[in-house]
Amino acid sequence: MSTAQKAKILQLIDSCCQNAKSTQLKSLSFVIGAVNGTTKEAKRTYIQEQCEFLEKLRQQKIREGRINILSMDAGVSNFAFSKMQLLNNDPLPKVLDWQKINLEEKFFQNLKKLSLNPAETSELVFNLTEYLFESMPIPDMFTIERQRTRTMSSRHILDPILKVNILEQILFSNLENKMKYTNKIPNTSKLRYMVCSSDPHRMTSYWCIPREETPTSSKKLKSNKHSKDSRIKLVKKILSTSILEGNSTSSTKLVEFIGVWNNRIRNALTKKKSFKLCDILEIQDNSGVRKDDDLADSFLHCLSWMEWLKNYESITELLNSKTLVKTQFGQVFEFCENKVQKLKFLQNTYNND
Amino acid sequence: MSTAQKAKILQLIDSCCQNAKSTQLKSLSFVIGAVNGTTKEAKRTYIQEQCEFLEKLRQQKIREGRINILSMDAGVSNFAFSKMQLLNNDPLPKVLDWQKINLEEKFFQNLKKLSLNPAETSELVFNLTEYLFESMPIPDMFTIERQRTRTMSSRHILDPILKVNILEQILFSNLENKMKYTNKIPNTSKLRYMVCSSDPHRMTSYWCIPREETPTSSKKLKSNKHSKDSRIKLVKKILSTSILEGNSTSSTKLVEFIGVWNNRIRNALTKKKSFKLCDILEIQDNSGVRKDDDLADSFLHCLSWMEWLKNYESITELLNSKTLVKTQFGQVFEFCENKVQKLKFLQNTYNND
């Protein structure tokens, strides 16, 4: 990876931010998935941090001609992940894999419940880590949804939340260490991927831009249940649009489904209007609870990173163009503002359907 | 490791337990550090589980001529570990290493506090894992004190306890995975160690056998603070006895200190009667709080495993002897009862000093 190139582009972006208004910095942070800092200074620092990641992905995509991202939403009985690929000249990412697993069923054959005994968690998460490498291609980036450590109401943490935090942390560490130890093996192809936490808040705010808040709507909008349902609804819309709209340049089409996925979604659509995501994945969730939210979230995390990377690529192209620097900076913030409007348009279209 | 040999000895021990009284099974569980089951059936199962571990250690010791155990008490600012070695024909284990580390100081150069950001915990615990392999010999077993997941009074879990649970779990997993991945490297010497959780309750009850409970004493005895102080006091006694009693067969001598340790303990003893364990390790704990309890606990965990292994070896010798089976079984429980009495004598001697 060319460090000089990276330093140059990060420097260009920071110069672009130097004299920008706070609202401009906010929209730039939004379209690349950066934390939105409370001060201009903090906004610039967070923008640089996120660009650091995205620049690595951009250069890997140039090198390999494509980028593969696997995004996970960790849970013991509901572990969901989605894997997508973006080719160099394709406008839309393709869905390669999308699964929900009951970890106790898959790795303990339901013979035991996952206790907090470190020997058991170590064994289970090692097998899960190896499972994520079974299907090719190996991702260039693994993202794991960042778990909250607080129960909504109290400053304490409950057992199930402790368990999923431990699962998230060991998985993150295992993925990094597998690369460190495997790359010590001489004469073998080196593993080269990134592991990164994905913030559920930034994912949610990218896809559900709060409309002008009316007193009643904002309370309802913020309820956890409502936010989950709206994300599931959004993913179903993205799926149906992807199948029904053949032409991949239409603005409301965000992702491609290939092969088996195409038929499954078509079947689910034709069978009944209100299908479940679990139906598409043909999940016989014998635990009875056919939850869709983990599937929706893992899908949206993956799609967010693809969107943030594409937006970042557009920004770097503007900054590498031959036009005057001042014009470039103006074009960058214009691009960001347009992107925000497009997303609002998309959400309105989907909500009005 | 000869599986047949292992199966044979485990079978012999179970036959020995088959017709034993509950009190006999209790003393056998006690001297080998097994969980004390509530029923005879449960006692036998837990005895077998513990013997499985100890048999692996015993065979490794026969093969290598010695056994090295490294025991840890995890904490972010107070990470303590103790490493001991037991040679085949030596009656007492030797202390090879004994440290307390402030993890943020050592691995983050105090530049940042350990947040629960998985990227930071992964980086810190990887460096800690590698650090544990820096000094030779590589242990045959790593034990990590099992952390409680509950705050004493409430059914909830507080942040610091979440952090130390995550530290314990990632460390356990890292140690196991380092071996799995490293052993995939062709033509390199294989890593061969065990990783096991060490139960603080079993350690504490081995060294602080509750005297006949009087109403007042039992409440005081059970207070967490009192139990910690008595363990620190016990370790100081073990240290001073080890130095002052040259002859290693005296019943109150439990461990050998060699080289630099000898002088440090002697200096600490001569300087002032009430020395701190931190003084011996020359820890300038600039955090101001020179806590001794982590040092004491890591020491006692390690010494417990050495004691449980030695007791297990004595039991297997009795069961492998030429005498009548019935007599062997009687001798086993006699040995256990004597061991319990010796420990009570030791504690009384120490407490009366």
Curated annotation (Swiss-Prot), chains A, B:
Keyword Lyase appears in the UniProt entry: no
Effect annotated for changing R150A: 4-fold decrease in activity
Major location category of this protein: mitochondrion
Cofactor (UniProt): Mg(2+)
Keyword Metal-binding attributed: yes
Enzyme Commission number(s): 3.1.21.10
Annotated GO biological process: mitochondrial genome maintenance
Effect of R231A: >200-fold decrease in activity
A GO term for molecular function: crossed form four-way junction DNA binding
Superkingdom of origin organism: Eukaryota
Subunit structure: Homodimer.
Function: Capable of resolving Holliday junctions. Specific for 4-way junctions. Seems to be important for the maintenance of mitochondrial DNA. Cleaves fixed junctions at the point of strand exchange. Cleaves after 5'-CT-3' sequence.
PANTHER family on file: CRUCIFORM CUTTING ENDONUCLEASE 1, MITOCHONDRIAL-RELATED
Entry protein name: Cruciform cutting endonuclease 1, mitochondrial
Organism in which the protein naturally occurs: Saccharomyces cerevisiae (strain ATCC 204508 / S288c) (Baker's yeast)
